[in-house]
Structures are given as structure tokens and as C-alpha cells.
Amino acid sequence: MDFQIIALDIDGTLTDDRKKISSLTLETLIEAEKKGIRLVLASARPAPGLFSIRDQLKMEQFGGILMSYNGGRITDCEGNTFYEISMDLATTRRILRFLEKLPVTVIVDDGKMFYVTDKNGYKVEYECRNNQMQCTEGDNLADWLTFSPIKLLLAVDPMKIYEVQEQIRNFLPEDLTVVRTAAFYLEIFPRRINKGQGLCDICRILKIDVRNSIAFGDSENDIPMLKAAGIGIAMKNAEMDVKKASDMSTLSNNEDGIPYALRALNVI
């Protein structure tokens, strides 16, 4: 098959457990770009959290695409936005007041800055460092927020995450969803946002048949993308539901699973 796009989840997929891209994975993906295959970084992260990886992969040189916020915002590597979908501000405020009752740390961003009620909250420093963004603190997010966010990020004790997710799911209006994006993260965003729709939209923009795409992922939020792609590939370290939704599995993110699969498919 003539593959023209490789869509890549970041954490637990493209990067290893140290948040690094291995030299073999880097070399293989740049080799794919030199063959004319476009890379798509498909992440729950805000766009600034993708910039370092974009630069390592030389994506600007080869026309790569950034899919941030699980597909809530799609841009080219120069920062030009193809589209963006955000939450309603009044609804967001109601949700924030509800979340005050739950054991979660809420992190909101506008693409440039994180907004929290406690800079020392669970995973706040980790998230700021990982995305290379600054953080500002205030007393009450529900009253303080003045913009419509694309998503709400919730850091949760992994032992409580399924229980908390169910409580939130029962509260949310029909047009919003809550998804696990890591063992300790939940994200709330518009239901029409998902990586699968994002991949389809990118293919439409680039005039590429989505069947000519490969996608790699490991988490629940990757499932729509793995189903939408011509070939969806789950990492060995993926959740079982992700593996069931994929066409095939590969080695883990610590074992160069991406190069292994691309060579098995004769892409490289």
C-alpha cells in the first residue's frame, strides 16, 4: 500500500518512559519523511508541548502536521491553524464547580499558559515541564476563567481514576465526554473531538485517502485514530481495549516499536 501519512501519539508511543525519542525511532521517521510520507503528531498535549518533538523530527521541513488537544486544534508546523473546537464557557464553569467536590487537580490552558488553583497540586509541575509552559495560580477557576478552553485536564490518583471518571461521566452534558489519557489523567472535551476525526480532517485537508495512513497509539484516546487509519497499530504497552481496536500490535515504546512495525510493513 502507498502510505502517505504516519500519525503518532506521543506519550507511551513515540517517546519511551523517560520521555525521549530513541535514535533508531528518530532516524526511521526522518527516513520516512524523506520518502515523502508526512508525519502527524497526535496528542492530548497543547501545541507548545509538541514543538520540541516537531523540531527533532524536522517536521517543518517536510510538511508535518500538529494535532493537539486530541484533535481539538490542528495546525501546520508554522503555527497556522486549520481549525479549533472549544468548550462553552458557561458550561465549563458549571463543570469546574462540580469538580471542586472531587479528588482531582484541575489544569486549564489557553495554549500559552496553564491555569490552576494550586501550583503544588498533583502533576502540575510535571505538566508544565513536559509542555514547556508557565503556570499561573488563582483561588477559584470557575469564577476566574475568562476564555473558552478546548479541554479540561484532570490529574487523578490512579487508584481512583475509574471511579472519578464514572462520576464525571454521569454529570456531563451529552455533547461532552471524559476520557483517560494516561494512568493518572482524565480529560474533558467536546464529544465531536477525537483523534480519529482529526486524522480524517487532516487527510481531507491534504487530499489524501485516510486508507493510506498508519497510526500508532497506546491509550483510550488513541482508539478512534487507530480505527480511522488504514492500519492502526497498538504498542505492546497499550491498554487491552486499545489492542482490541487495532489492526496489529508492535513492540513497546521502550523497544523501538514504531521502527519495528514500519519495517514489518515494508514502509521503510
Labelled PLM ranges:
Residues 23-123:
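Active-site phosphate-binding/coordination module
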Residues 46, 70, 111-112, 184, ...:
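A generic "binding-loop/recognition-motif" signal
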Residues 57, 62, 70, 171-174, ...:
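Short, structured coil segments at secondary-structure junctions
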Residues 98, 102-216, 237:
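Conserved acidic, metal-coordinating active-site core of Asp-based
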Residues 36-40, 62-64, 151, 211-212, ...:
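Short active-site oxyanion
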Residues 2-18:
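Asp-based phosphoryl-transfer active-site loop
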Residues 1-5, 22, 187-268:
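Mg2+-dependent phosphoryl-transfer enzymes with acidic/Ser/Thr/Gly-rich catalytic loops
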Residues 25, 50-54, 164, 168, ...:
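Hydrophobic packing residues within well-ordered alpha-helices of enzyme cores
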